[in-house]
Amino acid sequence: MTKRALISVSDKRGIVDLARELKHLGWDIISTGGTRLALEEAGVVTVAIDDVTGFPEMMDGRVKTLHPLIHGGLLARRDIEHHLQAAKQNRIELIDLVVVNLYPFKETICRPDVTYDVAVDMVDIGGPSLLRSAAKNHASVTVVVDPTDYPLVLGELASTGSTSYQTRQSLAAKAFRHTAAYDAVIADYFTRQAGETKPEKLTLTYDLKQSMRYGENPQQAADFYQRALPTTYSIASAKQLNGKELSFNNIRDADAAIRIIRDFKERPTVVALKHMNPCGIGQADDIETAWDFAYAADPVSIFGGIVVLNREVDLATAEKLHAIFLELIIAPGYSKEALAVLTHKKKHLRILELPFAAQEASEIEAEYTGVLGGLLVQNQDVVTESPADWIVVTKRQPNEQEMAALAFAWKTIKYVKSNAIVIANDHMTLGVGPGQTNRIASIRIAIAQATGQLEGAVLASDAFFPFADSIEEIAAAGIKAIIQPGGSIRDSESIAAANQHGITMIFTGVRHFRH
């Protein structure tokens, strides 16, 4: 009995060669619409789908493969006699191979000018149905959704006349993953269009971008998946210009660095980061000076760290970056001379190019945190704050320089692990106290790091001070300006202590915990 293949693809890569080889192996080919036209033009003889069904393609191609003569040929169990008898009685011929990929829905909705009606027209109905029918009956039917699998299938057919069960099972799993991901993108698009923010079911789809040697530690397996609808300003979309493949820890650190630099738009800024905490941030009128400030903030911790810049790297800055050991550099661009310096004798230095761009609110995706048995979903902490909304709660008002430093420190604090303290002036961090289980400990770490630079410095806290002892500790260091959310039942005690020591203190009303 002659074997039959059904071919209907949007992605026509390699399809002519596949069809020619199938014909050479003695297969009949059923095809549809544009696929059949492409094959016939290449000299491959096919059977039109409507010649099989006796029913014309209609409604602009919306109805063409949804027919019992097609799906019966896919779903009939070859090992069940009454299935075969039913097929014979109803003139259903068996189909042994399905090669289908789907309308480009994802690519369509990524176009900036796409209309809702055009998007709806790109929802494939017949294609997923064919894939699911073929995949369900993988005991007898081979289903192929990815052009990269054509050589595997042809190789087995040429060698043994059939595909192995293991291959059919693997390809069926791939087909189900493909249709699930396709539907997830459609569901996400319709959910957004309907303005729904809390769907009763959450379907996420990501594409494998990189298989890694290991994860956070060598004993942990890991892979990197990219969101199916790519975020334009993200580590996943960065272009690597030099160096070894990014590690799991590189990607997490780079993501943290990109999130920070996103908040510093107005002036040239450099962020140095280690273990997802900023160890130095500097801003200036030029990128070289901004680097000088970021480096001076903590010249010890930056060793083996990550640096992200929001301006093109010039030659002078590149020479300074090259002088120390870094894991990774991220910038919107590099001059030709700068790139030559950075790559000289540093073939392992990872260099990424990521054009700096402010994101629209609609482009900022939610954050997902896995927990045992579930998933936490929240908006990113990207609330827009204005100093005009802040309240000075002490007798002394901040002067202009203090206000600039407080704004800089407050912008920084939300990217430091809680309990978080940042000491800064108006152009650089001086001390960072991250991740302690009590606020006093974080204060002491930041003060110790900033020793000798506290004249005119300010301090930011990501959450309120529960007791006035924090203010006493800050006052003892000589710091005269504080910014914090407020909100403690003992705020009055902290305010009284600040007034006693001549400290100006601002309440923002916004907390910035980071776990």
UniProtKB/Swiss-Prot annotation:
E.C. code: 2.1.2.3, 3.5.4.10
Keywords for the protein's UniProt record, in alphabetical order: Hydrolase, Multifunctional enzyme, Purine biosynthesis, Transferase
Signal peptide: none
Domain MGS-like as annotated: residue spans: 1-145
Catalytic activity: (6R)-10-formyltetrahydrofolate + 5-amino-1-(5-phospho-beta-D-ribosyl)imidazole-4-carboxamide = 5-formamido-1-(5-phospho-D-ribosyl)imidazole-4-carboxamide + (6S)-5,6,7,8-tetrahydrofolate; IMP + H2O = 5-formamido-1-(5-phospho-D-ribosyl)imidazole-4-carboxamide
InterPro entries noted in UniProt: AICAR_Tfase_dup_dom_sf (IPR024051), Cytidine_deaminase-like (IPR016193), MGS-like_dom (IPR011607), MGS-like_dom_sf (IPR036914), PurH-like (IPR002695)
Entry superkingdom: Bacteria
Pfam family of the protein (one): AICARFT_IMPCHas
Lineage: Bacteria, Bacillati, Bacillota, Bacilli, Lactobacillales
Single GO BP term: 'de novo' IMP biosynthetic process
GO cellular component: cytosol
Domains: entry comment: The IMP cyclohydrolase activity resides in the N-terminal region.
GO molecular function: IMP cyclohydrolase activity; phosphoribosylaminoimidazolecarboxamide formyltransferase activity
Family named by the database record: Belongs to the PurH family.
Gene3D superfamilies hit by this protein: 3.40.140.20, Methylglyoxal synthase-like domain
PANTHER family per record: BIFUNCTIONAL PURINE BIOSYNTHESIS PROTEIN ATIC, BIFUNCTIONAL PURINE BIOSYNTHESIS PROTEIN PURH
UniProt pathway annotation: Purine metabolism; IMP biosynthesis via de novo pathway; 5-formamido-1-(5-phospho-D-ribosyl)imidazole-4-carboxamide from 5-amino-1-(5-phospho-D-ribosyl)imidazole-4-carboxamide (10-formyl THF route): step 1/1; Purine metabolism; IMP biosynthesis via de novo pathway; IMP from 5-formamido-1-(5-phospho-D-ribosyl)imidazole-4-carboxamide: step 1/1
Protein name: Bifunctional purine biosynthesis protein PurH
